[in-house]
């Protein structure tokens, strides 16, 4: 392998492989070898290669046989030196993109290998510009305008949007390649009759064969291969046409733009149609030509009888100023089965562009403003009543560029109506002239999918794909018939609409879920508030019922009166002590608070002397007389514990009394009234100083 070479940097290879996972490792290593492991050069080269692998535009034969949904047919001008009939890789010009979902065309079995099968993306158009937003929305979720055009480049230097994604083996043509998309829809039974346009002069190096097929009648747009009307296997061999077209007999000069030279365009005559055979039989087709003039050597147009109601085409096509009108002629059962006597293809030049249209059937932006000579063609044969079309009965010129103007001319001797209708009586003796006029169409807004004149707000809803066109008679529901066009424009537009609607559905579902959660939260909050209200009501009811009885009220009134008496006695005692003066008070005499406490190890012993105890007993007697003048029951209670408490303490602590006399008397704190040891200078409880 290439990555095993010594000059390859494995770290750079891994970085590039991680940056571009869609590109195979051998391709990345080969790119590194070609660029001498230059990271910038490899990054630029792999960025260009990444588009091909992301959108599957590389030419893989095995995958092409299985996954091909598009038919690229190169049309246009290419130098004779690079034109080889046996190698499809050397064919240059304008690639023709055609949907071939119902079957498969094997490019290896075609005589000239002029078919390049490219798988079609499932969610994007076949040709997408670099600055194109496929969801039709900008950041503000509005219909975004047409993307700004790129700067104008030289005709021989710039490449189109499709060329940027073409395989590397494709030679860049001298003239800009313009994509052509052919979209056909089945509208009738398959009849093995084809219209062939074959020139009469040989060896034209500027021609390219065109092979156009179209899905079967039963196909609703995208089907599997078991419903195809022709063999999907590689055994489906194309008829052998001459890939080298002859030089034309007559020329008609045409000029499309100031930067483009006049290239001759010829008028062709076709041999009898019965002489050409085709393995494909498909209904009504519509071919489109591009604005870059070129020689078309073979045009394979297989029309068949159409079952479309005549009223779909009875309305005259809308006139456009300074150009031909666009008309559709379905092949009816009354048309001539014999050969077409004359087929004329003319190219008209337009002097002044027409008014700007306001609709586009496809979301593809081909950047037509890059070069003045580039005018991509994008014409669809989808029914006008298709959901992607806004006007039910009026076909209009589509994408900016050169639409295909098909005009059917019948001699006046024919008994049929000369107006475009599906029922035209013809006979083999009457010569028929089938004219194909190609002219320039006015530029239109690319992203205006909805017709402004009829549907200014919302597009018509997408009908189910299973609604196929039915035979005549149902004139009232033809507007809702889903066209079974399998072109990339309808498919990409439908997929984009479905994606957009799916996103809207998900967003609405998310909003609905959020609203449901909000509703549940509000319900829970309301339930909680109701519960609190009920609890308050219950408490209020219980409080009103718990009224005390008269006996309880009498007891409470007696307790309240007793408490008031005790408060009054305490207040009078305080007043009496204040009247005697705080300086005369003996701290030891007021130590009855500590005497009434239960004895414990932390409580200091009582150090009152006998004389002090006598003085204290006298003061207590006087206080008891003054306080208990109103309450007669208190003196026995107060006298008994005091006499009982003082006696035992004085008898039980003779030795601690001597020790304390030796150390000094304890002092009482003025702030907390705590009796402290005489050796302490600060209160043991509140840390207040002894002498203030």
Swiss-Prot record:
SUPFAM superfamilies: Ran binding protein zinc finger-like (SSF90209). GO terms for cellular component: extracellular exosome. GO terms for biological process: positive regulation of canonical NF-kappaB signal transduction. Residues 215-230, 249-298, 349-387 have a biased composition (Polar residues). May play a role in signaling pathway. Residues 8-51 form the CUE domain. Transmembrane segments: none annotated. It comes from the Eukaryota. Pfam families: CUE. Residues 608-620 have a biased composition (Basic and acidic residues). The keyword rRNA-binding does not apply. Residues 496-580 form a coiled coil. Residues 409-422 have a biased composition (Low complexity). One of its GO terms (molecular function) is zinc ion binding. This is Mitogen-activated protein kinase kinase kinase 7-interacting protein 3 homolog. A zinc finger (RanBP2-type) spans 662-692. The keyword Repeat does not apply. InterPro entries: CUE (IPR003892), TAB2/3_CUE (IPR041911), Znf_RanBP2 (IPR001876), Znf_RanBP2_sf (IPR036443). Residues 138-159, 206-333, 349-427, 598-662 are annotated as: Disordered. It comes from Xenopus laevis (African clawed frog). Keywords: Coiled coil, Metal-binding, Zinc, Zinc-finger.
